[in-house]
Swiss-Prot record:
It holds the Pfam family YpsA. It comes from Lacticaseibacillus casei (strain BL23). This is UPF0398 protein LCABL_17010. Belongs to the UPF0398 family.
């Protein structure tokens, strides 16, 4: 049981070489996220709480929004570290962030100030671990990325209290890709 509030984070899109919504890797990632979230929802998950980073965080919001018709009580929160989060992004990425923030049940900045110092990012990570009951990361310690800091914070929280940390690793993604390929092949053979 992951509890009622789940922090979802992980790799940035560029760390996985996913560039665009038609990338085949994205379908695998979203399928893996969907399967895991559905399992948690069936166990009583109420809130998905994530950030706005380009990559796993935004993909998790997209997947969660797609699950809301099946789980009408499911809520989604997008928290960002500071008020001007994403302002350095290109116009398309800023628009995507704004659109997703407009579709979730709750969105706010942890620090009610524009970016000033790295301590705001540390405060954000602390906020996420304190205000959730568990963490799900699309992350593999054998392939470090920026989510390493989130992983370390989640593991540190798990050392202090009951705070399950579940990873979707590269091996897990490979298994999902194989299952999807087998299902597609079976479908093709049956047509």
């Amino acid at each position: 049981m992951v509890g009622k509030r789940l922090w979802v984070t992980g790799y940035r899109a560029y760390e996985l070489n996913v560039f665009g919504s038609n990338d085949p890797k994205l379908k695998v990632l979203k399928t893996s996220l969907k399967n895991t979230l559905m399992q948690f929802l069936d166990e009583g998950l109420e809130w998905l709480i994530t950030g706005g980073q380009l990559g796993v965080e935004q993909w998790a919001v997209e997947v969660a929004l797609g699950l809301k018709p099946l789980y009408p009580d499911f809520k989604i929160a997008m928290m960002v570290p500071f008020t001007d989060f994403g302002k350095q992004w290109n116009e398309d990425n800023q628009g995507q962030l704004a659109a997703l923030r407009g579709q979730v049940d709750f969105s706010d900045a942890v620090s009610q100030a524009p970016y000033q110092q790295p301590a705001q990012l540390q405060g954000y990570t602390r906020f996420m671990t304190i205000h959730t009951d568990a963490a799900l990361l699309v992350y593999d310690p054998e392939f470090p990325g920026k989510a390493k800091w989130d992983y370390q914070a989640a593991e540190a929280m798990a050392d202090r209290r009951d705070y399950p940390v579940q990873l979707i690793t590269m091996d897990d993604l490979e298994e999902t890709a194989q299952a999807m390929a087998e299902a597609e092949n079976e479908h093709f053979q049956n047509d």
